[in-house]
Design a protein with these regions (language model features):
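Beta-rich carbohydrate-recognition and catalytic domains
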Residues: 1-84, 88-157, 166-191
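Non-cytosolic head/periplasmic domains of membrane-anchored proteins
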Residues: 160-162
């Protein structure tokens, strides 16, 4: 999979543009004239136009794109990585929400990001829980075990793929519950 820009005049039918922009699962936000990107496995990027070009962040954290406290590599548990991060500008700050493969339970996490011109100077705040699986459709009534990479064919004790958005000034988070068996929206206060 790759990412391209697609345009629409009516919001229903889209025309993909020719150039590939980069890796899969782009999520984008704009702050101070810069479009910040998050992609598969926590890769980060930026651009100044929706048409590109994309400047991809180098793997500056011992060969990884994110510091250990964000990616989960500091846990001592092998195989932990960001599944789908979402980068979001709100009130002049950049927020990153994500879930991590290998967490038990996989859940919606958050950290604040302070970007800089030099990728090595980017700062990532502490990671905190935004939401954990509740009983019923979110899977909180099921056994808890470390999540694995790939499609979830059954309902599991996991929340995945958080994405923040605003509506009438209120921040909300869309997410997958029960691993991939349902979609939820939760109000987020305090960002």
């Amino acid at each position: 999979q790759q990412t391209r820009l697609a345009t629409s005049t009516d919001g229903l039918y889209f025309t993909p543009q020719a150039p590939l922009l980069g890796p899969p699962y782009f999520r984008a936000t704009r702050l101070d004239g810069v479009i910040y990107l998050s992609m598969w496995e926590g890769r980060l990027g930026r651009m100044t136009s929706w048409e590109g070009p994309v400047e991809l962040a180098p793997p500056i954290h011992d060969g990884y794109h994110l510091p250990p406290h964000v990616s989960g590599r500091d846990s001592g548990q092998p195989g932990r990585q960001i599944r789908h991060g979402h980068i979001f500008a709100h009130d002049g700050r950049i927020h990153m929400t994500f879930s991590r493969i290998g967490d038990a339970p996989e859940r919606c996490l958050h950290c604040e990001v302070v970007p800089a011109d030099d990728w090595a100077d980017w700062r990532f705040g502490p990671v905190s829980d935004l939401l954990r699986p509740a009983p019923s459709w979110e899977g909180g009534d099921l056994p808890m075990r470390p999540s694995i990479m790939g499609t979830a064919w059954d309902r599991l004790h996991e929340l995945r793929d958080p994405a923040l958005f605003t509506d009438n000034g209120q921040v909300y988070m869309a997410y997958c519950g029960g691993a991939e068996s349902g979609l939820g929206i939760a109000r987020v206060d305090g960002l």
